[in-house]
Design a protein with these regions (language model features):
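Alpha-helical segment of the N-proximal tetratricopeptide repeat
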Residues: 11-49, 53, 60
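Structural signature of tandem alpha-helical TPR/SEL1-like repeats
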Residues: 28-37, 61-73, 95-110, 119, ...
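TPR alpha-solenoid repeat register
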Residues: 50-51, 84, 118-120, 154
C-alpha cells in the first residue's frame, strides 16, 4: 500500500467517525450539531450516506430544498444507493408534489444497494391511494409487506385498500 492509500484510508476512517458522531447527535435531536458533523464528515471523505443523512436532518427542520440537494449530491457520489432516491420522493411529497415523487420512488426500487425496498413500495402505495388508484396502492402496500412482514403501516394500508376494493 502506498502513502496515498494510507492517507485515503485515514480520511475514510475519520469521516466514518464523524458520521457516527453526527448520527448520535441526530438521534439526540441536536440537529445543528448533527449538521456540523455530517458536513465535516463530507469534507473529510464524501460518501453518499453522509450526504443522504445530512439531507434527512434538513428535512427534520422542513428544509426540503436543501435536503433534496444533499440527496442529489449523494446520487452523484454513488448512484447505486437507494436511500437518496426514496428520500427525494418523500421530500417532494412533503412539499405537495405527489406526481414528481413517483419517479424517485421507482428509481429507489431499481437501486442495487438498498436495505429495505419496503419503503419506496409503501410510499408508492400512499401516492396511489391519494390518487384513488386503489389497486395500484394495494399492490405496493402488499409488496412493502412482502419485503418487511412486520411493517404495520403497510398492513393497515393494504387492509384499507382491500376494504375499498370489496
Amino acid at each position: 500500500m502506498n502513502r496515498y492509500d494510507d492517507a485515503s484510508d485515514l480520511r475514510r476512517y475519520e469521516a466514518n467517525q464523524l458520521f457516527h458522531e453526527a448520527y448520535e447527535a441526530q438521534q439526540a435531536n441536536d440537529y445543528e450539531r448533527a449538521i456540523e458533523l455530517y458536513k465535516r464528515s463530507i469534507e473529510t471523505y464524501p460518501t453518499a450516506e453522509a450526504h443522504t443523512f445530512l439531507g434527512w436532518v434538513y428535512s427534520f427542520q422542513d428544509r426540503y430544498d436543501e435536503a433534496i440537494e444533499e440527496c442529489l449530491e449523494a446520487i452523484r457520489v454513488d448512484e447505486t444507493l437507494g436511500n437518496p432516491y426514496n428520500d427525494i420522493g418523500s421530500y417532494l411529497l412533503a412539499k405537495g408534489d405527489s406526481y414528481g415523487s413517483v419517479r424517485w420512488f421507482k428509481r429507489a426500487l431499481l437501486a442495487p444497494r438498498y436495505e429495505s425496498y419496503a419503503f419506496p413500495h409503501f410510499n408508492l402505495g400512499k401516492v396511489y391511494e391519494n390518487r384513488r388508484k386503489f389497486l395500484d396502492a394495494a399492490r405496493h402496500y402488499g409488496l412493502a409487506l412482502k419485503q418487511k412482514p412486520n411493517f404495520r403501516e403497510a398492513a393497515v394500508g393494504l387492509r384499507r385498500m382491500q376494504s375499498r376494493l370489496n
